[in-house]
Each structure stands twice: as structure tokens, then as C-alpha cells.
A protein has these predicted regions:
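Catalytic adenosine-cofactor/nucleotide-binding cores of aminoacyl-tRNA synthetases and other
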Residues: 26-116
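Beta-strand segments within the central parallel beta-sheet cores of soluble alpha/beta enzyme folds
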Residues: 19-23
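Short, hydrophobic/amphipathic alpha-helical patches that form generic packing surfaces
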Residues: 11, 57-64, 190-197
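Secondary-structure capping and boundary motifs in well-ordered enzyme cores
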Residues: 36, 47-48, 77-88, 119-127, ...
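Conserved, charged catalytic cores of large soluble enzymes
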Residues: 93-134, 154, 158-175
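Single conserved hydrophobic/aromatic residue that forms the stacking wall/gate
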Residues: 1-6, 10, 214-221
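Short, charged/polar, low-complexity loop and linker segments
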Residues: 69-74, 129-136
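Basic, alpha-helical terminal appendages of large translation-related enzymes
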Residues: 136, 140-142, 151-216, 221
Length: 221
């Protein structure tokens, strides 16, 4: 009978049972349930005509209803995309790329000669910890938590840049202060490359574009 068959299956030693099942609660829209018939939804064709897919992917990921119901709200979408995805992540990448391209460049990456990672062991440890946390969260299918850890890397990078202020030294003559500041910019460049990989599950299109830039520079380096 069925109960006997089920018991036999359960007793099999070679049968691997699921022990990490991903499940979410409900995602609401502006306080109500999604409904195609009531035209209460986010229509992807219309959305993609005006906006980038990665911004929606980011908001859905950071607002994922993993442990309780969450609400898709357009005002929160605008706020989180502007302040987090653009203001934290995008701003960091833009600052690093802009500053790096202001350096005089012969052949290869102009930041290579400023690689002094031994001077930044504390920052590297912080970044490694964030990556480890993100990996652990992903393995446990806690994607919102993983994304927060990755965004923490961008925050570390922004703090590093702000403290080093490399824009003050780019056009200055070579000195210890200049080398120290530009070593922070060089590390920030590497952090951007790391972010391009870590963010790919959440923002694949912009990550691919960023990876192409870094792949090109690595080939020249």
C-alpha cells in the first residue's frame, strides 16, 4: 500500500532529502494583492520601456518577503534605488572610474604601480568578512541578507575613498602622501572589480558591463 511504500522510501539510506527549502511569504503591491484581472500589477513590458531591469531586480531582492509579507511601493522603490543602488554602489563605481581615468596612462592600468595591499590589511579583512557573510547567506537562500552584505562592501569602499581623498593628489608631483592616497584608489579599483562579480546575481546587466571594463583593463595591465 501507499503507506508501506512511503515508509520504504523514507528508510532508504541513499535517498537525499531536502534540508534547505526556499520559501517566501507574500509580496503585496501598494497595500493590496497583485491581480491581473483587476489590473493591479507591475507590467514588465511597460516598465522595461522606461526603466532599467537591474533597478527592479535590486528592489525586489532587497525587499524580498523571506520571513514576512512585504509591500512593493513605488515611493520606496525610488528611494532605495536612488539612495542605495545609485547613491552607494553606483556612486562608488563612478568615482573610482572617473578618478582612475584622470591619471596619466602610458600602457596598462595606471593604478598598478600603486598596489600596496599590505598597507590595507584591515580594509581587506573587512571586505573578506562581507564576502564570506554574503556567501553564507546565499547558501542558506537568504538573498536579502546576502545583498546587504555586498552593499556593505560598497560602503567600505566609499569610506576608504573619502578618507584617502585621491582627487587632491592626482595632478600633484610624486610624494609619499600621493602614493599613499593613490594606493587607496588602487584598492578601490580592485573592490569595484569584486563588486561587479558579487552583484551579478542581483544586477546582471550592469555587472556584465562593469566586468567588461575591468576585463579590458586587466588585459592591458
Amino acid at each position: 500500500d501507499q503507506s508501506s511504500a512511503a515508509s520504504d522510501v523514507y528508510k532508504r539510506q541513499d535517498l537525499v532529502l531536502e534540508d534547505n527549502v526556499s520559501a517566501n511569504e507574500y509580496l503585496m503591491l501598494q497595500g493590496g494583492q497583485f491581480s491581473k484581472s483587476r489590473k493591479h500589477a507591475v507590467w514588465l513590458p511597460s516598465y522595461l520601456e522606461q526603466y532599467d531591469a537591474d533597478s527592479l531586480r535590486y528592489y525586489l531582492s532587497i525587499n524580498m518577503p523571506e520571513t514576512h509579507d512585504t509591500d512593493f511601493r513605488w515611493d520606496e522603490y525610488v528611494d532605495r534605488v536612488n539612495n542605495e543602488l545609485i547613491g552607494t554602489y553606483g556612486n562608488f563605481v563612478h568615482r573610482v572610474m572617473t578618478l582612475a581615468h584622470r591619471l596619466e596612462c602610458g600602457e596598462g592600468n595606471p593604478l598598478s604601480k600603486y598596489d600596496r595591499f599590505s598597507d590595507h590589511s584591515k580594509i581587506l579583512k573587512e571586505v573578506d568578512n562581507q564576502i564570506s557573510s554574503a556567501i553564507e547567506s546565499m547558501e542558506k537562500q537568504r538573498f536579502k541578507e546576502a545583498l546587504r552584505s555586498i552593499m556593505g562592501i560598497a560602503q567600505i569602499g566609499n569610506s576608504l575613498l573619502q578618507e584617502a581623498a585621491p582627487w587632491k593628489y592626482i595632478n600633484e608631483d610624486e610624494s609619499d602622501e600621493r602614493s599613499t592616497s593613490l594606493s587607496s584608489l588602487s584598492l578601490s579599483w580592485r573592490i569595484c572589480s569584486c563588486l561587479a562579480v558579487c552583484m551579478r546575481p542581483f544586477t546582471p546587466f550592469s555587472s556584465d558591463r562593469l566586468c567588461l571594463l575591468y576585463t579590458s583593463d586587466a588585459a592591458d595591465d
